[in-house]
């Protein structure tokens, strides 16, 4: 069984990780965020599998709840920022596909134009 002090320390570490991930999302450091997300998920899994001792008093329980609430608030903010980033990337992909289509159409037109500019077989004999 884990001590109340150790449990509080683990919850505070989880909060620290969630704050770090939120900061990374705000600053657009997506690669680093993904790396930290792995550590974060492992920390959450560790806490999920850690039973809360019965001898923890109501003040400590309240403190743990407050920490968890802040962690969940941070997760909601990160989720919003990730959705915004996904929308941006989706827009960029759409623009890229349009540009590719335009380039392909232009290439076809340019190829046909060259054929139109080629001299006719009768014109080469004169």
Swiss-Prot record:
Identify this protein by name: Flagellar protein FliT
Q: Can you tell me which family this protein belongs to?
A: Belongs to the FliT family.
Keywords for the protein's UniProt record, in alphabetical order: Bacterial flagellum biogenesis, Chaperone, Cytoplasm, Repressor, Transcription, Transcription regulation
- State where the protein is found: Cytoplasm, Cytosol
Region (FliD binding), start-end ranges: 60-98
Entries under Gene3D superfamilies matching the protein: Flagellar protein flit
Q: What does this protein do?
A: Dual-function protein that regulates the transcription of class 2 flagellar operons and that also acts as an export chaperone for the filament-capping protein FliD. As a transcriptional regulator, acts as an anti-FlhDC factor; it directly binds FlhC, thus inhibiting the binding of the FlhC/FlhD complex to class 2 promoters, resulting in decreased expression of class 2 flagellar operons. As a chaperone, effects FliD transition to the membrane by preventing its premature polymerization, and by directing it to the export apparatus.
- Give the encoding gene's name: fliT
Which BP terms does GO give this entry?
bacterial-type flagellum organization; negative regulation of bacterial-type flagellum assembly; protein folding
Q: What parts of the sequence cross the membrane?
A: none
Required for homodimerization as annotated region, ranges: 1-50
Q: What is the first-listed, main subcellular location in coarse terms?
A: cytoplasm
Any single Gene Ontology cellular-component annotation = cytosol
Species the sequence originates in: Pectobacterium atrosepticum (strain SCRI 1043 / ATCC BAA-672)
- Keyword tRNA processing tagged: no
Please name one Pfam family that this protein belongs to.
FliT
* Subunit structure as annotated in this protein's UniProt entry: Homodimer. Interacts with FliD and FlhC.
